[in-house]
């Protein structure tokens, strides 16, 4: 019995991953649970899933507990896109930066604390110096004299571009989720 449940979970995780390739791996268990228990007859019937008003309310807390904020935004965008393409647009509240606890209702009361001034931290000037090279080089190697001046101004390096390979991790992640689903049911 457990083996058949594992096979079903694997198939469902694979379908969810294939249908929602932009969804981060951390959220796949949330979708798997929500999409297999919402009463829709097929896992890939996103028009049915998206028409269920409880879908965002069921997936959101799970995603908040399993994914970092950046990936929560990706999940939100993917759900809105998938539901719109299926013909059943949904509205999902924006992801809050501090997702470690549930948001509390806002009030119209005035703030109780007043702004304070802060003193900037003292700065230490960057060291500068001049120097002359000394020593001898290898025979036949470069030679000469010169000076070195340190301006104390740091330079910024260019960030690494991951290119199209960054999208590959989402598809590979789906297989990882499928394997985890099998392990959970065994």
Curated annotation (Swiss-Prot):
Residues 19-108 form the CFEM domain. Residues 89-159 are annotated as: Disordered. Residues 148-159 have a biased composition (Polar residues). Its main location: secreted. One of its GO terms (cellular component) is side of membrane. Disulfide bonds join 26-67, 30-62, 40-48, 50-83. Heme binds at residue 45. Belongs to the RBT5 family. Residues 96-131 have a biased composition (Low complexity). GPI-anchored cell wall protein involved in stabilizing the cell wall. One of its GO terms (molecular function) is metal ion binding. InterPro entries: CFEM_domain, Extracellular_membr_CFEM_dom. It comes from the Eukaryota. Transmembrane segments: none annotated. A lipid is attached at residue 163 (GPI-anchor amidated glycine). It holds the Pfam family CFEM. Residues 132-144 have a biased composition (Gly residues). This is GPI-anchored hemophore ARB_02741. The CFEM domain is involved in heme-binding and contains 8 cysteines and is found in proteins from several pathogenic fungi, including both human and plant pathogens. The CFEM domain adopts a novel helical-basket fold that consists of six alpha-helices, and is uniquely stabilized by four disulfide bonds formed by its 8 signature cysteines. Residues 1-18 form the signal peptide. It is found in: Secreted; Secreted, Cell wall; Cell membrane. Residues 164-186 form a propeptide. The GPI-anchor is attached to the protein in the endoplasmic reticulum and serves to target the protein to the cell surface. There, the glucosamine-inositol phospholipid moiety is cleaved off and the GPI-modified mannoprotein is covalently attached via its lipidless GPI glycan remnant to the 1,6-beta-glucan of the outer cell wall layer. It is a lipid-anchor; GPI-anchor. Keywords: Cell membrane, Cell wall, Disulfide bond, Glycoprotein, GPI-anchor, Heme, Iron, Lipoprotein, Membrane, Metal-binding, Secreted, Signal.
């Amino acid at each position: 019995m457990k083996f058949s449940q594992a096979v079903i979970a694997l198939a469902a995780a694979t379908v969810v991953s294939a249908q929602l390739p932009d969804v981060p791996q951390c959220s796949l268990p949330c979708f798997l649970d929500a999409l297999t228990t919402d009463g829709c007859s097929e896992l890939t019937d996103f028009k049915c899933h998206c028409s269920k008003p409880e879908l965002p309310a069921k997936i959101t807390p799970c995603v908040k507990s399993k994914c970092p904020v950046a990936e929560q935004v990706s999940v939100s965008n993917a759900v809105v896109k998938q539901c719109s393409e299926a013909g059943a647009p949904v509205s999902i509240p924006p992801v809050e930066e501090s997702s470690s606890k549930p948001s509390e209702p806002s009030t119209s009361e005035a703030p109780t604390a007043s702004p304070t001034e802060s003193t900037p931290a003292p700065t230490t000037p960057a060291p500068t110096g001049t120097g002359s090279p000394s020593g001898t080089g290898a025979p036949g190697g470069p030679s000469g004299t010169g000076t070195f001046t340190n301006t104390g101004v740091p330079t910024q390096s260019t960030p690494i571009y991951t290119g199209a390979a960054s999208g590959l991790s989402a598809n590979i992640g789906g297989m990882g989720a499928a394997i985890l689903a099998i392990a959970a049911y065994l």
